[in-house]
Every structure is written in C-alpha cells, then in structure tokens.
Design a protein with these regions (language model features):
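Active-site microenvironments that recognize anionic phosphate/pyrophosphate groups
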Residues: 1-161, 167-238, 246, 268-272, ...
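Alpha-helix N-cap/loop-to-helix boundary motif
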Residues: 209, 243, 247-250, 254
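Extended C-terminal subregions enriched in glycine
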Residues: 250-268
Length: 338
C-alpha cells in the first residue's frame, strides 16, 4: 500500500499510492443499484420503509437493495489500515499512509448529481457522513477526517455517479494545520474568530451569494479559483459532528441551492468541494468549520503552481453577483416560491 512523504523543506505532503489510480473500465457503473457486488460490502445503507429510514448493511451472502444512500470502503483507497510500518526522517521523510477511505454514494440514480438531488436527499447524505465521521474519530490512528467531492470530468474522479469521499489521516493535512494555527493566532491577538470576522464582513455585502437561517454562502475576498465560494455557519461552530438535524437540513438547503445555481450559471462545470472541519481530538487546533467549493473553469499556470499566487479572470464581486442571481432563483424553486 501507499506511503506519505513530505517535501524536503515545506510541510507539503504527497501520498504515493499506485492502487488509487486504477481506471474504471467496466461498462457497468459499480455504484448503481444491482451492481453492489462490484464494490466492497456496505457498512451502512439507508433504506426508506414505511416513511422511516432504516440503517442496514450488507451481509456475507446478501446485499441490501432499495437503498437511498450507501457507504463502503473504497476499492481504490488513497490510504489503508494495512500499510507497512516503515518510517524515515528528513530529508527523505516518509510514514505509512495509514487511514480509512470510505465512499458515500449520494443517490441510487446514476443521472442525479449533488446539484440536482432533493434537499431531503442531501440531508440523508449528511446524516450518513456525520455518522461515519463520529465512528472514525473513535478509531486508533485517526487524527483527521477529510470529506470531499470530485464532480465532473475535470475534477479528478473516474466514476461519474455522484459520491462523497471520506479519507482519514494519522496527521493533520497541511492546509488544515496552517488554517488552525492562523485561526488560533488571530484569536489570541484580536480576541475574535477570523471566520466569524469574515462572516460579519460578508453578510449582505457585495460578495454574498445566499443566506439561510443559519448559513451564509459567499465568494471569498481572495479566491484561488473563478466562482469559488464558501459556506459557513453564521454562529461560531467548531464541530460538524455535533450539529443538529435542523442544522443538517439547513446546510443541505444552501448546498443544494448554491450547487444548483453554480451548474446553471457555469455550464458543464466540474468542481471540487471540501469540508474544512476541526480535528476532533485536538482542542488546540479548532477551526470554525465551513465548506469550500472550487469550480474548475481553466488550468493553473506557472504562477499558481510555482509561487502560490492565483490569477483570477473574474472578480469575486462579479462572480457573486452572477451566482447570487442563479442561486436565489434555485432557492426559490426549492422552497416553492415562484
């Protein structure tokens, strides 16, 4: 299995994992109903019955059918719990790429996307994600759980059926570590959470896209991608695993409305989506959790790759204006307002 290596100088990580780049060659989609044998057995399958959601899982000789959300271990994992126990220090730093890699299939319908499923279905998906997140943090060797989406041909996915990846790590990913350290420093220096500060600035401002009762979506002041946007709780909150069903329903509404608006405003857009969550086991590394969406509308140049300076062809204010109109229309249709 793979190993996690670090840059000679920077806290930049690479997972060397040949098993995670296998091409899907079958004409059958392994995530569609009826093809459950093409994946690992489900650890959790949500099944609607008599108006209730049942939590089931595959057995040794049978597969759960009529599911609405399905979770299983990836057959092409980026990390593994059976990695060789080998370490080396800098300049050739290496450690086992230890962890769990789960796939959460968001809908039984192959043609559905995260921009078209119902708000209720989004809620079901997030309930499952929250369930797996809580379980993962009870496991030895799990320091952080990343939750991300690759949508579209340019996103890095090799299976188009809508799904969410959950990948755990034994160390903090560099971006989360840097974000946590910066948040902690600003909190100590200014006495305010930087995400709360950003939220207060962006509410009703020129970069706001949409807001619901408990969440706001906005294009960040210094985006890395054209049409990039973030979704964050209005109230200070560091734990996604503890949010209530009401909050799950609310964030599902704004996710569905903004992704629906994005895909209508930017035709055939691929995107990546990442949950930036606190590491549950490190109280000194807490962050105001939020979701970041990165539309892929072009290619990075040497400026971005070589220097970390991002060139944007549209201002976040203009992007928010266009996305806001599309997302408000999407929200109105979702809540039954014409």
């Amino acid at each position: 299995m793979g190993n996690l290596r670090k840059d000679y100088i920077l806290e930049r990580s690479s997972i060397i994992s040949p098993s995670s780049v296998k091409k899907h060659n079958s004409k059958k989609c392994p995530y569609c109903p009826g093809n459950e044998s093409m994946t690992n057995p489900s650890l959790l399958s949500l099944v609607a019955k008599d108006g209730m959601l049942q939590r089931l899982q595959d057995g040794e000789d049978f597969f759960v059918t009529d599911w609405s959300v399905r979770v299983f271990e990836s057959k092409e994992p980026a990390v593994s719990t059976s990695t060789p126990n080998t370490y080396s220090d800098r300049p050739l730093y290496s450690e086992p790429a230890y962890g769990y890699h789960y796939v959460v299939v968001a809908s039984p319908n192959h043609k559905d996307s995260l921009a078209t499923i119902s708000v209720e279905q989004w809620s079901n998906v997030l309930v499952v994600v929250q369930d797996r997140l809580r379980w993962l943090y009870t496991q030895k060797g799990v320091t952080y759980v990343s939750i991300f989406v690759n949508h579209g041909k340019e996103s890095g996915t090799n299976i188009q059926h809508s799904h969410i990846n959950m990948v755990s790590f034994s160390t903090l990913p560099p971006i989360i570590e840097a974000e946590a350290e910066a948040s902690h420093r600003i909190l100590n220096e200014k006495g305010v959470c930087p995400m709360c500060q950003a939220k207060d600035v962006e509410i009703a401002g020129p970069r706001q896209i949409l807001q619901t009762e408990g969440f706001i979506a906005f294009c960040p002041w210094a985006p890395s991608y054209p049409f990039e946007f973030w979704i964050c709780p209005k109230k200070h909150n560091t734990s996604f695993s503890k949010i209530t069903q009401k909050e799950i329903n609310d964030v599902s509404l704004i996710l569905r409305a903004t992704l629906g608006g994005l895909t209508k405003e930017v035709k055939d857009v691929s995107f990546n989506l990442a949950f930036h969550l606190s590491p549950e086991k490190k109280n000194s590394k807490q962050i105001h959790w939020h979701i970041e969406v990165y539309p892929i509308t072009g290619h990075w140049s040497g400026l971005e790759r070589g220097y970390g300076v991002f060139l944007n062809t549209i201002s976040p204010e203009k992007a928010a204006e266009a996305l806001g109109a599309a997302c408000r229309k999407e929200l109105a249709s979702l809540v039954g307002i014409e």
